[in-house]
From Swiss-Prot:
InterPro entries: EF-Ts_dimer_sf (IPR036402), Transl_elong_EFTs/EF1B (IPR001816), Transl_elong_EFTs/EF1B_dimer (IPR014039), Transl_elong_Ts_CS (IPR018101), UBA-like_sf (IPR009060). This is Elongation factor Ts. Belongs to the EF-Ts family. The keyword Protein biosynthesis applies. HAMAP family: EF_Ts. Associates with the EF-Tu.GDP complex and induces the exchange of GDP to GTP. It remains bound to the aminoacyl-tRNA.EF-Tu.GTP complex up to the GTP hydrolysis stage on the ribosome. It comes from the Bacteria. Keywords: Cytoplasm, Elongation factor, Protein biosynthesis. It is found in: Cytoplasm. Residues 81-84 are annotated as: Involved in Mg(2+) ion dislocation from EF-Tu. It comes from Acidithiobacillus ferrooxidans (strain ATCC 23270 / DSM 14882 / CIP 104768 / NCIMB 8455) (Ferrobacillus ferrooxidans (strain ATCC 23270)).
Length: 292
């Protein structure tokens, strides 16, 4: 039977698939729109599965907070290119998934992907956009009597901070989260640095100080001073506050009686993902010539 341009247009709008694909499945389905959609979904899912092996190291970080700001989630959703990372449908998927995770109290990305509707939507978007899409990681923070602070920088860095204490405010939560985004602390307090890390850093400092030729007692003081400086550089409470470097984050928090940082999490798009090497233009051309 003849397939009209209007039918093709409707199927394209409903599915996001290409014009020729829509015309083909409409012909096979003899004009049955729902059957054609099922055919596209089946073929789209197959395409999505093939793309799953491709490296997805671009993407976005999104956060979601409950109305009382006592719960929050941060989610990383990856794709292959910066172009798709700015796509409205991709961004909507990320935002909706974060909202769903918050509403359902989900603790990790695996729990989110266990939802058949989420996985179906992800695979449908893979088919539509032509790139592998991954809900890579999710973390959920909660406080009993305080606030969760959230900050997202350029969709590429996202932070949640759990502040416990009645005096904690939304502004303080956001400020501390912003600081974490910028300063990359590794722990909350200097005392949380592992003994192994301390010993490793101390050995490095001893080696460096030994070359100075100074007396042993002076070297010991040098090592102690440098080690304390290092601890304050990697611990949140010891770092100079980004909005007011004349005081530390610890001093900022102390100005809010009874408030303490329980936990923080910082996600950055693609961190820890080994990207596939990109060949330069000349190499790509040579590969094509040799393959022809």
């Amino acid at each position: 039977m003849a397939i009209s341009a209007q039918q093709v247009k409707e199927l394209r709008e409903r599915s996001g698939a290409g014009m020729m694909e829509c015309k083909t499945v409409l012909t096979e389905a003899e004009g049955d729109m729902e059957a054609a959609i099922d055919l596209l979904r089946a073929r789209g899912l197959a395409k999505a599965d093939k793309k799953a092996s491709r490296v997805a190291a671009e993407g976005v970080i999104v956060t979601a907070l409950s109305e009382d700001q006592k719960r929050g989630v941060v989610l990383e959703v990856n794709c292959e290119t910066d172009f798709v990372a700015k796509n409205e449908d991709f961004l909507a998927l990320a935002k909706d998934c974060a909202g769903q995770a918050l509403a359902q109290g989900l603790k990790d990305a695996e729990a989110l992907l266990a939802d058949a509707g989420v996985e179906e939507r992800r695979k449908g978007l893979v088919s539509k956009l032509g790139e592998n899409i991954s809900l890579r990681r999710l973390q959920h923070l909660q406080v009993m009597d305080g606030v969760i602070g959230a900050y997202v920088h350029g969709s590429r860095i996202g932070v949640l901070v759990a502040l416990e204490g009645q005096a904690a405010t939304s502004e303080l939560g956001r400020d501390v989260a912003m600081h974490v985004a910028a300063a990359r602390p590794e722990v909350i307090h200097p005392g949380e640095v592992s003994p192994e890390r301390l010993n490793r850093e101390k050995e490095i400092l001893i080696t460096q100080a030994a070359d100075s030729g100074k007396p042993a007692d002076i070297i010991e003081k040098m090592i102690s001073g440098r080690l304390n400086k290092l601890l304050n550089e990697i611990a949140l409470t010891g770092q100079p506050f980004v909005k007011d470097p004349d005081r530390s984050v610890g001093q900022l928090i102390q100005s809010f009686p009874g408030v303490e940082v329980l936990e923080f999490v910082r996600f950055e798009v693609g961190e820890g993902i080994e990207k596939a090497p990109t060949a330069d233009f000349a190499t790509e051309v040579m590969a094509q010539v040799r393959g022809s």
